[in-house]
Design a protein with these regions (language model features):
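Conserved SF1/SF2 helicase motif Ia
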Residues: 36, 40-43, 48-79, 251-255
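Conserved Walker A/P-loop ATP-binding site and its immediately adjacent core
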Residues: 48, 61-90, 97, 123-128, ...
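Pre-Walker A adenine-sensing motif
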Residues: 22-28, 244-247
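Conserved Helicase C-terminal RecA-like lobe
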Residues: 2-19, 29-33, 48-53, 57-63, ...
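Inter-lobe coupling linker of SF2 helicases/translocases
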Residues: 105-150, 164-167, 171-174, 178-207, ...
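Conserved nucleotide-binding/hydrolysis micro-motifs of P-loop NTPases
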Residues: 72-75, 97-99, 124-127, 214-215, ...
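SF2 helicase motor core recognition
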Residues: 126-133, 202, 216-217, 267-269, ...
Length: 537
C-alpha cells in the first residue's frame, strides 16, 4: 500500500510531495515499530520528515513530534518546515534559545507546556537531556552485565583470562561500570546538573524523527570475539537515544520512531544490527536474534581480510566480520522496518561523475617519516608504549598528515613546506579548472583538514599557491570563516552559488550535509582520504 491516499491538508499552495515521499510518510504512519527511511541523497528526506510529523499530528498518531537534526541544519530545517506548512505551530531551539543554561531550561519548559505541531532541536542539545536517572541506571546495569557475560565467554573460549581480547572486553566492562557508578553516586556531568529536574519523559514528546541517523550508529556490541574490528563501547549520545526509543516503546509509541539517512550502513556491518536495535527490537527478539552473537551467527561470516597496516608500509591479514550470509532472510527482516529508495528508483538528474586519481610522488622526507611510523607501530604492538602516549589511531592520523605535508606533524612546525606535494598538485589542478570554467563561473570545493589559527596551515598555503597561479584572493574562501552561524554560512553559500566565490575550502564535516552549492560546481578535490566510506557519498 503506497501513500497516494494522503491528502496532506495544510501544505503550502503550489507544493506537492512526490510519490516516493508520500509512500515513505504512509509507511511510517502505518508502522507498529520504528521506520528507517533510507533514501538516497537528494530524494527529499527533509520534506518527508516534516510531512510525517504534521500528518502524525493531524491523524492522531502523535500529539507532539520532535525532529532531531544536525546542529548546523537547525535553521535550514525550520525554514523548510515553514515553507511546507506556513501555518504550523513550530518550536525551534535556535541560537537564542541556547544562549545560556537558563534559556535552555526555559526552552524545555516551553516544549512541555505547549501544543506544537513540531519541535526542532539540534543533536547536541537533544543528547544532553536524558530519561530519568532510574531508567538510565537500569539500562546501564544491563549493559554492564552484557559485558560481564562477554568477558566470561571470551575467557572460556580462549582458555586464558590474560588474552588481549579478554582484556579489551574487561576494560570496556570497567568503563561502563565506572560511568554507572558515577551517575548512581550523584557525580553527574555539568550538563546533567544544568538540566536537573527536567526529564525527557516529562516533555510530552511522543514521536521522534531523527535526521542523519547514521550519526547515532556507534552503539557498542559486547561480543566475545572482540578482535574482529567491532566497536565494543557505545558513544554516550547513542546510549541516550536508545534509552529514549525504549521509553517510547514502553509508553505505547513504538511506531512513532523514524530514522532518516542516505547511508544506513557507513562503516561496519554491525550498524545494520544497531538500526534494528533502535527501530525493531521486537522483531529481533521474536526471531531469537536480540544479541549480536545470535544475529551475527545468522547473517554474518568472519573472513580473513587483507588490510593496509595503520603505519602504511605494508599489509596484514585480519579476521573481520565482513561478509553477509542468508541474504534473502536478512533482506526480508530489513524490509520489515525500512523504506529504501536509491537513485535507480527515482532517477535524479545527476551529472555524470568522473573520478580522477592524482598520483603525487613521495619525497625522501616523507619516506623517512613513514619509516618512523613503522617503528612506532612495532613498539605499540609489542606493548612497549602506554596507549595514552601512542597508539595505532595516532599513527594513522600522523600518516595522513605526512601524506599532506610533514610540516603538520608536532615538532616540525619550523620545517619548510613541501614544494611539490599534494598541496601544489591540488593548486595546479584548481588553477587550471578555474581558468577553463571562467566563462560560466564554475566553482570548486577543496576537502582537507581544518585551518589552524596562527602559524602555518595547509589551507592558507593552498590559498597562497592559488593566488600565485593567478586565482584572485577574493574568489577564494574558507567555510570555517562562517563558523557555526547559519546566517553567515548561507551568505557564503549564496556567493558560491552566484559564482562570486569560485573556490571554497573546508573539511568533510563542514562541506558535507547541508552544503547546497552545486549549481555551478565543476570539481571537488579531496586531499585527504576520508575515514569512512559514507564520506564519499
Amino acid at each position: 500500500v503506497g501513500g497516494s491516499y494522503l491528502t496532506t491538508p495544510g501544505i503550502a499552495h503550489g507544493v506537492r510531495l512526490r510519490p516516493h515521499q508520500k509512500d515513505a510518510v504512509a509507511r511510517a504512519l502505518r508502522s507498529d515499530e520504528g521506520t528507517l527511511i533510507a533514501h538516497v541523497v537528494g530524494a527529499g528526506k527533509t520534506f518527508e520528515g516534516v510531512a510525517l510529523s504534521h500528518e502524525a499530528k493531524r491523524l492522531g498518531k502523535a500529539s507532539k513530534p520532535m525532529l532531531v537534526v544536525p546542529n548546523h541544519l537547525v535553521d535550514q530545517w525550520a525554514g523548510d518546515v515553514l515553507r511546507l506548512y506556513p501555518a504550523g505551530r513550530i518550536l525551534v531551539m535556535d541560537k537564542d534559545a541556547q544562549r545560556n543554561p537558563e534559556s535552555v531550561r526555559r526552552f524545555w519548559g516551553r516544549v512541555a507546556t505547549g501544543d506544537w505541531d513540531a519541535v526542532i532541536v539540534p543533536e547536541s542539545r537533544f543528547s544532553q537531556l536524558h530519561v530519568s536517572k532510574e531508567r538510565r541506571l537500569r539500562n546501564m546495569r544491563a549493559r554492564v552485565d552484557e559485558f560481564a557475560h562477554a568477558v566470561e565467554a571470551a575467557a572460556k573460549a580462549r582458555g586464558d583470562d590474560k588474552d588481549p581480547t579478554v582484556k579489551r572486553l574487561e576494560a570496556a566492562r570497567k568503563s561502563a561500570e565506572t560511568a554507572m557508578n558515577r551517575l548512581r553516586d550523584g557525580k553527574e556531568s555539568r550538563d546533567d546538573k544544568a538540566l536537573a529536574g527536567i526529564e525527557f519523559e516529562s516533555l510530552g514528546v511522543d514521536m521522534l524523527i531523527v535526521d542523519e541517523a547514521h550519526h547515532f550508529k556507534n552503539l557498542g556490541v559486547p561480543v566475545a570475539s572482540a578482535d574482529l574490528g567491532m566497536q565494543l563501547s557505545s558513544a554516550a549520545k547513542c546510549e541516550d537515544l536508545l534509552d529514549k526509543c525504549e521509553w517510547l516503546r514502553e509508553a505505547g509509541h513504538g511506531g512513532n520512531i523514524a530514522f532518516m539517512t542516505g547511508t544506513p550502513v557507513s562503516n561496519s556491518m554491525s550498524e545494520l544490527y544497531n538500526m534494528q536495535r533502535y527501530l525493531a527490537p521486537g522483531t529481533l527478539k521474536a526471531q531469537g536474534l536480540d544479541t549480536f552473537a545470535a544475529w551475527a551467527g545468522a547473517y554474518g561470516q568472519v573472513v580473513p581480510t587483507v588490510e593496509l597496516k595503520p603505519e602504511g608500509n605494508g599489509f596484514q591479514v585480519k579476521q573481520r566480520f565482513a561478509r553477509f550470509q542468508n541474504l534473502p532472510e536478512l533482506m526480508n527482516a530489513v524490509k520489515q522496518f525500512t523504506d529504501m529508495i536509491t537513485n535507480d528508483d527515482i532517477q535524479l538528474p545527476l551529472p555524470e561523475l568522473e573520478q580522477v586519481p592524482v598520483p603525487v610522488p613521495i619525497t625522501d622526507r616523507q619516506k623517512e617519516e613513514m619509516e618512523e611510523l613503522s617503528d612506532r607501530a612495532d613498539r605499540v604492538r609489542d606493548g612497549g608504549v602506554p596507549p595514552e602516549d601512542d597508539n595505532l589511531l595516532k599513527i594513522t592520523g600522523d600518516g595522513r598528515k605526512i601524506a599532506l605535508d610533514p610540516k603538520l606533524l608536532k615538532g616540525h612546525e619550523n620545517d619548510r613546506p613541501l614544494e611539490n606535494g599534494k598541496i601544489q598538485a591540488c593548486a595546479e589542478n584548481v588553477a587550471r579548472i578555474w581558468q577553463e570554467e571562467t566563462p560560466h563561473l564554475g566553482t570548486q570545493l577543496c576537502d582537507s583538514s581544518t585551518p589552524a589559527s596562527g602559524g602555518w596551515n595547509a589551507y592558507q598555503d593552498l590559498k597562497d599557491r592559488l593566488v600565485a597561479l593567478g586565482v584572485p584572493a577574493e574568489q577564494i574562501a574558507f567555510v570555517h570563516d562562517a563558523g557555526d552561524n547559519p546566517a553567515k554560512r548561507e551568505q557564503l553559500f549564496a556567493k558560491v552559488r552566484s559564482g562570486e566565490i569560485r573556490v571554497l575550502m573546508g573539511s568533510t564535516q563542514k562541506l558535507g550535509t547541508g552544503t547546497n552549492v552545486q549549481e555551478r560546481l565543476a570539481a571537488i578535490h579531496d586531499l585527504d582520504c576520508p575515514w569512512r566510506p559514507a564520506d564519499l557519498e
